[in-house]
Amino acid sequence: MTDQQLNTAHLTTPAGRPRARALGVPFGGTPGRWNAITDVPGVEVGYRTIIRGETARTGVTGIHPRSRDGALDPLAAGYAAQNGNGEMTGAAWVEESGTTSLPIALTNTHAVGIAHAGIVAWAARHYPELGDNWSLPVAAETWDGYLNDINAHHVTEEDCVAALDAAGSGPLDEGAVGGGTGMICYGFKGGSGTASRLVSHDGTSYTVGVFVQANFGARRELVLAGRPLGDVLPEDDPLSEYRAAPPGAGSVIAIVLTDAPLLPHQCTALARRVTLGLARTGTAGSHSSGDLFLACSTANPGGFSRYGQRGPRPYDQLTFLPWDAIDPFFTAVVQSTEEAVANALCAGEEMTGYRGHRIPGLPRDRVAALFRARAEGARRRLD
């Protein structure tokens, strides 16, 4: 892969939408090949985007943490919540067992049950050996009812299956795609966003990837790379006049995946660091927001026995990082989360939907000019 291809993947999505780095927004750390959660080996992501007429602005995002072929192999997992006005199915089992298996789906609030059923349907088709065994997959949601007729139940089980079947590796589209189609972030069009960081330990390079469904924050709160923007971009904020929800309401789901070998409690520690990355974008965490996070390690394949199918071995065995080596992975989560939110915003474009509700896209030219002026000012101070 050439340097030009690498730079293109960091600057634009496959659909040609700009990413935050294309606007001159600076970030710390070293991103992976695609600067996406798919930089973690084996991770596959797919979208089912539903835009029909004036009422449907929604969809499903499907994530295979260990590829389709590893869907039944439990991963070390940890769950954390910043604010609990939301739903992530399977979270109680993650907390109890320290593991999860099967794909993950992200969608809208009133379709979370459909997405859960869709994951089970997908697994039953591809893994008939599951038989009558129980499944507790992870399906999570954010509310898209401003742009989408959320009570019309546009999302079906087949949409979820289609998202999982469409999943692949490589660079990812961002913004109004998949479960992020109708989502709003800081009063601008938000949605799906992703980023990654490389972390070296004991001579091995590991990857931490984050995927967010960004649907949170009031306009006045917005910060990018330490630059407050809410005060300079206050105009054209139709959501501020929407009385059905208080400012800052919405929700954000974050999925953190890494190929570093971790214990379940270490995964929980990574999930908690998502909060710090979100805070860098300005939010204080609204009481009306559902901010739920899942972190998993794709290392140690076969390390956990499937529940009820232990087989001949009397013990499970895992390799894991010592706790005193984990801080760089915390930093990677924080940096990737911040950039994933910024990427969701930068890919967003104006959308009109249900009841004529309209949300503007981030004014990218103005944001780019602000960061260009900041960079030029910094250079002058050094001269």
Can you describe what each PLM-predicted range is?
Residues 2-383:
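Alpha/propeptide regions of enzymes that mature by internal proteolysis
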